[in-house]
Amino acid sequence: MAVKRIKNHSSGKRQTVVVDYKSILTTSKPEKSLLVTLPKKAGRNNQGKITIRHHGGGHKRKYRIIDFKRNKDNIYGTIKSIEYDPNRTSFISLVVYADGEKRYIIAPKGIKVGDKIISGNENIDILLGNSLPLEFIPEGTLVHNIELSPNAGGQITRSAGASAQILGFDETKKYILVKLNSGEVRKFRKECRATIGTVSNDEHILENLGKAGKSRHLGVRPTVRGSAMNPNDHPHGGGEGRSPVGMDAPRTPWGKRHMGVKTRNNKKSSTSMIVRRRK
């Protein structure tokens, strides 16, 4: 896989760095039976109020139904294509199983068309793209698409280039210790499933959109500085010219302390599952 640096033909292209999709993807047409309509919300809730800032516009998309559960056990599937998915940073692969069923999965790094994958329990080989419970995966193995609770479907380590490392059982033998990308060490139920390998498109982090219009195509609206707003819109707003914050610490748009303040609630039930906080 490679990235392309666009030549300086115009100011919109001057800083652009993009992933060379043509060298990776095998088709531009998705599987129609696995597509559903994706209505645009523009960051609004059912009352029309903004609940997520900087969302809106963007190119029309359809959602690809992804198999995060990987619960089709002991039936081999063949990788038929590696495709672009506008709804995530990683690539996706179309899998056709021996019984004819088709499913999309998150494409692991290094997977190729024609490769065989399988899901199951202790009898499954530790090979790229295979999915099995954490208790049967050897220490040191890199995995992705990890379940937070059994049969819930993968929720952790799904973005481009992400992976987590198996560290082994804890002292109770009921949980598996896993080191996440952030450096956090966390306990997972040993029955939770994970997929072998690293998520594809690891060079996504090197991309540079180059111009504001590219962000608008992705549905990302501008982020305005608080100091450029009016005082009724932001705690940093108002004043004559470029005024300082005027407080002992920066604030969020809702008046809470910002930068360097821990916001995690220690009373969350999942706190007991965190062995070491992220760096």
UniProtKB/Swiss-Prot annotation:
Keywords: Ribonucleoprotein, Ribosomal protein, RNA-binding, rRNA-binding. GO terms for biological process: cytoplasmic translation. Disulfide bonds: none annotated. GO terms for molecular function: rRNA binding; structural constituent of ribosome; transferase activity. GO terms for cellular component: large ribosomal subunit. SMART domains: Ribosomal_L2, Ribosomal_L2_C. Residues 223-279 are annotated as: Disordered. InterPro entries: NA-bd_OB-fold (IPR012340), Rib_uL2_dom2 (IPR014722), Ribosomal_uL2 (IPR002171), Ribosomal_uL2_bac/org-type (IPR005880), Ribosomal_uL2_C (IPR022669), Ribosomal_uL2_CS (IPR022671), Ribosomal_uL2_dom3 (IPR014726), Ribosomal_uL2_RNA-bd_dom (IPR022666). Pfam families: Ribosomal_L2, Ribosomal_L2_C. Residues 254-267 have a biased composition (Basic residues). Part of the 50S ribosomal subunit. Forms a bridge to the 30S subunit in the 70S ribosome. Belongs to the universal ribosomal protein uL2 family. One of the primary rRNA binding proteins. Required for association of the 30S and 50S subunits to form the 70S ribosome, for tRNA binding and peptide bond formation. It has been suggested to have peptidyltransferase activity; this is somewhat controversial. Makes several contacts with the 16S rRNA in the 70S ribosome. This is Large ribosomal subunit protein uL2. It comes from Ureaplasma parvum serovar 3 (strain ATCC 700970).
